[in-house]
Amino acid sequence: MEVNILAFIATALFILIPTSFLLIIYVKTVSQNN
C-alpha cells in the first residue's frame, strides 16, 4: 500500500497542532495554580 506523504503530513499536523495547543494551555493553568 502506497502512502501519500502529503496526506500523512496533513493528518499529523491536524492532530498535533490542537493537541500541542491544549497541552500548552494545560501547562499554563497548572503553573498558575501553584
Swiss-Prot record:
<keyword id="KW-0812">Transmembrane</keyword>
<keyword id="KW-1133">Transmembrane helix</keyword>
<feature type="transmembrane region" description="Helical">
    <location>
        <begin position="5"/>
        <end position="25"/>
    </location>
</feature>
<keyword id="KW-0793">Thylakoid</keyword>
<comment type="function">
    <text>One of the components of the core complex of photosystem II (PSII). PSII is a light-driven water:plastoquinone oxidoreductase that uses light energy to abstract electrons from H(2)O, generating O(2) and a proton gradient subsequently used for ATP formation. It consists of a core antenna complex that captures photons, and an electron transfer chain that converts photonic excitation into a charge separation. This subunit is found at the monomer-monomer interface.</text>
</comment>
<keyword id="KW-0150">Chloroplast</keyword>
<keyword id="KW-0934">Plastid</keyword>
<dbReference type="Pfam" id="PF05151">
    <property type="entry name" value="PsbM"/>
</dbReference>
<dbReference type="GO" id="GO:0019684">
    <property type="term" value="P:photosynthesis, light reaction"/>
</dbReference>
<dbReference type="InterPro" id="IPR037269">
    <property type="entry name" value="PSII_PsbM_sf"/>
</dbReference>
<keyword id="KW-0604">Photosystem II</keyword>
<keyword id="KW-0472">Membrane</keyword>
<dbReference type="GO" id="GO:0009523">
    <property type="term" value="C:photosystem II"/>
</dbReference>
<dbReference type="GO" id="GO:0009535">
    <property type="term" value="C:chloroplast thylakoid membrane"/>
</dbReference>
<protein>
    <recommendedName>
        <fullName>Photosystem II reaction center protein M</fullName>
    </recommendedName>
</protein>
<comment type="similarity">
    <text>Belongs to the PsbM family.</text>
</comment>
<keyword id="KW-0674">Reaction center</keyword>
<keyword id="KW-0602">Photosynthesis</keyword>
<dbReference type="InterPro" id="IPR007826">
    <property type="entry name" value="PSII_PsbM"/>
</dbReference>
<comment type="subunit">
    <text>PSII is composed of 1 copy each of membrane proteins PsbA, PsbB, PsbC, PsbD, PsbE, PsbF, PsbH, PsbI, PsbJ, PsbK, PsbL, PsbM, PsbT, PsbX, PsbY, PsbZ, Psb30/Ycf12, at least 3 peripheral proteins of the oxygen-evolving complex and a large number of cofactors. It forms dimeric complexes. Detected in both etioplasts and green leaves; PSII is only assembled in green leaves.</text>
</comment>
